[in-house]
């Protein structure tokens, strides 16, 4: 006895799956649609109608003829039961549709001509067509580099903020240097004020009249300089407050 080839065995298995196990008629897209019960057994719609007509099942329930599992009937209509989508795909893609399919049945190239060949004009009922969409990989353009290009956006406001910050730092350093020099000058004037009078008297007693007069005259001069310094300091503070940029 000659053994079947793998292709013939697969064909026989597919053909067996397309038959109802009660009436052994082939499923179709009209009266013998493959209906799936809750127990996952498949029965054609015509056989289910006969089971209901025989009255073997309670109202609103269908008893599976294979395992006696009860399946609730939504709206008490057989048509409300779910169809077996895999068998519907095989039925829909049968005949001339098979010629247009690729070798791998899970891959289908979507073109208008291919879709038109899969749908028969005579099938006016609602059919289910399951399609696996594949991504077609195209060769990348040779002009594009494989290294990703990242462009950093630097708003113009950042430059203005940086400039203002730099100017403020320079202005702050200048102001600090000016205040330090003024403080040193005040200390020198204070030292000169408190030491010039006794030093001048000592020089006058020592008969060094010229130097003594000079040192004694430094007392009112230092007072005048201190007054001028106080006035200049007030003016400078007002000027700095007006010119310094707001933070």
Swiss-Prot record:
Keywords, sorted A to Z: Cytoplasm, Membrane, Metal-binding, Transferase, Transmembrane, Transmembrane helix, Ubl conjugation pathway, Zinc, Zinc-finger
Compartment(s) of residence: Membrane; Cytoplasm
Membrane-protein topology: Multi-pass membrane protein
Enzyme Commission (EC) number: 2.3.2.27
Zinc finger residue extent: RING-type: 20-68
GO terms under cellular component: cytoplasm; membrane
Pathway: Protein modification; protein ubiquitination
Enzyme class: transferase
Alphabetical GO biological process terms: protein ubiquitination
Reactions catalysed according to its record: S-ubiquitinyl-[E2 ubiquitin-conjugating enzyme]-L-cysteine + [acceptor protein]-L-lysine = [E2 ubiquitin-conjugating enzyme]-L-cysteine + N(6)-ubiquitinyl-[acceptor protein]-L-lysine
GO molecular function annotation: ubiquitin-protein transferase activity; zinc ion binding
TM region positions: 184-204, 211-231
Record note on quaternary structure: Interacts with ATP6V0C.
PANTHER family for this protein: E3 UBIQUITIN-PROTEIN LIGASE RNF182 (PTHR46675:SF2)
Domain comment in the entry: The RING-type zinc finger domain is required for E3 ligase activity.
Function: E3 ubiquitin-protein ligase that mediates the ubiquitination of ATP6V0C and targets it to degradation via the ubiquitin-proteasome pathway. Also plays a role in the inhibition of TLR-triggered innate immune response by mediating 'Lys'-48-linked ubiquitination and subsequent degradation of NF-kappa-B component RELA.
Protein name per the record: E3 ubiquitin-protein ligase RNF182
Naturally occurring in which organism (per UniProt): Ailuropoda melanoleuca (Giant panda)
Species lineage: Eukaryota, Metazoa, Chordata, Craniata, Vertebrata
Gene expressing this chain: RNF182
């Amino acid at each position: 006895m000659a053994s079947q080839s793998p292709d013939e065995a697969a064909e026989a298995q597919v053909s067996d799956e397309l038959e109802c196990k009660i009436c052994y008629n082939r499923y179709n897209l009209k009266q013998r649609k493959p209906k799936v019960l809750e127990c996952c057994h498949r029965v054609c719609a015509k056989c289910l109608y006969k089971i209901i007509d025989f009255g073997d099942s309670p109202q609103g329930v269908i008893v599976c003829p294979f395992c006696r599992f009860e399946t609730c009937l939504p709206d008490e209509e057989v048509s409300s039961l779910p169809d077996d989508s895999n068998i519907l795909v095989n039925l829909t893609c049968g005949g001339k549709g098979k010629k247009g399919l690729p070798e791998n049945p899970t891959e289908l190239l979507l073109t208008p001509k291919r879709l038109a060949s899969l749908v028969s004009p005579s099938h006016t009922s609602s059919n289910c067509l399951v399609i696996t969409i594949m991504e077609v990989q195209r060769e990348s353009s040779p002009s594009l580099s494989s290294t990703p290009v990242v462009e950093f956006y630097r708003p113009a406001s950042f430059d203005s903020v940086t400039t203002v910050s730099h100017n403020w730092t320079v202005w702050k350093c200048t102001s600090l240097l000016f205040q330090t020099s003024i403080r040193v000058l005040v200390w020198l004037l204070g030292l000169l004020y408190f030491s010039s009078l006794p030093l001048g008297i000592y020089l006058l007693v020592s008969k060094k009249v010229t130097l003594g007069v000079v040192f004694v005259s430094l007392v009112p001069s230092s007072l005048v300089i201190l007054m001028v310094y106080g006035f200049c300091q007030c003016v400078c503070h007002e000027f700095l407050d007006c010119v310094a940029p707001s933070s």
